[in-house]
UniProtKB/Swiss-Prot annotation:
Single GO biological process annotation from the record: L-histidine biosynthetic process
Protein name in the entry: Imidazoleglycerol-phosphate dehydratase
Enzyme class (EC, first level): lyase
Enzymatic reactions: D-erythro-1-(imidazol-4-yl)glycerol 3-phosphate = 3-(imidazol-4-yl)-2-oxopropyl phosphate + H2O
Pfam short name (any one): IGPD
This protein's UniProt keywords: Amino-acid biosynthesis, Cytoplasm, Histidine biosynthesis, Lyase
Length: 198
């Protein structure tokens, strides 16, 4: 097991340059700068409600659009999550959360399975929130799930306000991840799988 449950990564391409540090057993502190204001707001909520400490500095080709930056942050965040979780001994593995924000209600279900998958059932009533394209939320969570090697289901059960839907979704994922990475005191450090490996 990675006792510190911490990872620091740097990834540079011709499109983005990203440095990210993640501590799973944190205090919900964050220092985030992606260059996209609303995305920063969502990542801050993810750290706060997941109990993670998150530092992020991303420079991307925002003169084109936000796609490369958002997707690549998802990749690096997923890689850091996978590294920090270590061999998965003693974790709960599964997490589930329903989180409301006024009229919006989102449900997130997580399995730290080693089998990457995203089931996305979220529809936004408008194409942008601030400067961020709402279609990029799916790209972020897909990149995260694929790189973290987790199965993630996110469903919006109700909502009419795009900001509320996005924030409810990020908070639901945060709460589900918080449960999934937590230690099961009855497991005696075992791998949470009948196969003995994840």
């Amino acid at each position: 097991m990675n006792e510190s449950r911490h990872a620091r990564l740097h990834r540079a391409t011709s499109e983005t340059d990203i440095t990210l540090a993640l501590t799973l057993d944190g205090q919900g502190r964050s220092d985030v700068d992606s260059g996209i204001g609303f995305f920063d707001h969502m990542l801050t909520a993810l750290a706060k409600h997941g109990g993670f400490d998150l530092e992020l500095k991303a420079k991307g080709d925002l003169h084109i659009d936000g796609h490369h930056t958002v997707e690549d942050v998802g990749i690096v965040f997923g890689q850091a999550f996978r590294q920090a979780i270590g061999d998965k001994r003693g974790i709960e593995r599964f997490g589930h959360a329903l989180v409301p924000l006024d009229e919006a209600l989102c449900e997130a279900v997580v399995d730290i399975s080693g089998r990457p998958y995203l089931a996305w059932n979220v529809v936004f009533p408008r194409e942008k929130i601030g400067t961020m394209d709402t279609e990029l939320f799916e790209e972020f969570f897909r990149a995260f799930a694929m790189s973290a090697h987790i199965a993630l289901h996110l469903t919006c059960k109700s909502g009419t306000n795009a900001h509320h839907i996005a924030e409810s979704g990020f908070k639901a994922v945060a709460r589900a991840l918080k449960v999934a990475v937590s230690h099961d005191p009855r497991s005696a450090g075992a791998i949470p799988s009948t196969k003995g490996v994840l």
